[in-house]
Swiss-Prot record:
Residues 58-67, 96-107 have a biased composition (Basic and acidic residues). GO terms for biological process: transport of virus in host, cell to cell. It comes from Potato mop-top virus (isolate Potato/Sweden/Sw) (PMTV). Residues 1-126 are annotated as: Disordered. The keyword Nucleotide-binding applies. Its EC number is 3.6.4.-. The lineage of its organism: Viruses, Riboviria, Orthornavirae, Kitrinoviricota, Alsuviricetes. The N-terminal 84 amino acids contain a nucleolar localization signal. It is found in: Host cell junction, Host plasmodesma; Host nucleus; Host cytoplasm; Host nucleus, Host nucleolus. Its cofactor is Mg(2+). This is Movement protein TGB1. Participates in the transport of viral genome to neighboring plant cells directly through plasmodesmata, without any budding. Multifunctional movement protein with RNA-binding, ATPase and helicase activities. Engages in homologous interactions leading to the formation of a ribonucleoprotein complex containing plus-sense viral RNAs (vRNPs). ATPase activity is probably required for vRNPs movement complex assembly. Intracellular delivery of TGBp1-containing vRNPs to plasmodesmata is facilitated by TGBp2 and TGBp3.
Amino acid sequence: MESGFNGSRPHRVKKDLPDRVNPVNTQGSSGTTGNAFRKNNNNKTQNWKPRSGPGNRNEGDQTKNNKSDLQQPSEVHPENQVRPESSTGESVKQQSEPHRVLEDKKQSGKTAGSSVRIPEEGGGGLGSANYLGKRQLDFVAKLCVESGFKSTGKPLKRYPAEFFKSSGLLEKFVKYLSSRLDKGCNLSQRESEVVLKNLRSKRAEQSFLAGAVTGVPGSGKTTLLRKVQCEGGFNSIVILGNPRSKTEFSNLPSCYTAKEILLLGIAIKCEVLLIDEYTLLTSGEILLLQKITNSRIVILFGDRAQGSSNTLCSPEWLQVPVIFQSLTSRRFGKATANLCRRQGFDFEGGEHEDKVVESPYEGSSPATDINIVFSESTREDLLECGIESTLVSDVQGKEYNTVTLFIPDEDREYLTNAHLRSVAFSRHKFALEIRCNPELFMQLINGELASKQQPQTDRYGPE
């Protein structure tokens, strides 16, 4: 900004932004452990038959992860940008549409590409009241392109400070949580009371920019998030939507589960909030996380195919724009990609060969790294035969070399849930064995199990 008198800069306005922080190279560690595919009685034969009767079966805990509910929020109008003032006391003329995310001419062709659009700066240095976060978004865009994600050309969306309340989500979230104090909702009664207290607290509200980085399973979302957090050099916090991933992120700085922040009894602040597996959270939880951290930028990482818009609690009703996406998986190969496409998922597999095989539900098969099931009742059946297994909802975001999926006829209804199908069919790198009866398998590979879920967008969450 130049003075209108002699070309010298006003003494109160800095000419340059602060220098970028040099990236720090770090490596994340990951590993898988296989569950023993053995019976606890060596005298028993491998050919077994689970107890029958649908009356003994429960639906399990799967439905708890189908986050979706609430009416579509009204259109969000951008706030007025803070205008930096000149040394003469006159306000600098405000640019038209200050909230727009524009193309960065300096970065075009070098890092983020010509289609990447980042916010214009409102003046001031990093940490000042006028700083909108150009450096952070510049760096995130650069890493996204380097990691194989493609820009959608959409800008980040600005949400006004009062959006949580004005959208109606705050009222519905409080009402829903209050009505379930004695029913769970992934929180104990004491935890629910703490969350309600945080919702009603008089915290300073902050407008924020939000965008989503989405990708199919195995596209590198987690690796990208690690790089952003470790090499960015800015004040950021990572939130894990899946708490079971905490051990895998133990070496990542400023990384917490969503519940740890939702129950936090002190005030914290960060510039950038990075949320992993955001489809496992509700819209109200995401907005409360932003409120607690007072963050200016919120970036969601996840797979939209693993979400749902069936109820208002779904993050989809926040209408966060997808700014980068990837449809190519480095995890599984062509056979799995073909199976997923028949299920309605727009997946592209890697170049390596993998396999999807079918085996009878009753009988024996080679051991794999992990056995997964849809319902708690099926897990208990297998455990009686000495076979350990894990719920599909608990392995979202995880990866294994080989996987066995058990599907008894009683669990057929779970296959109509697109979210659960997407997770179950995409955890392996080299081999997926599906244990079910032949008729069900043919319906599965032919994509004949269409979703039967009915919209309930008049409700915040499941009853």
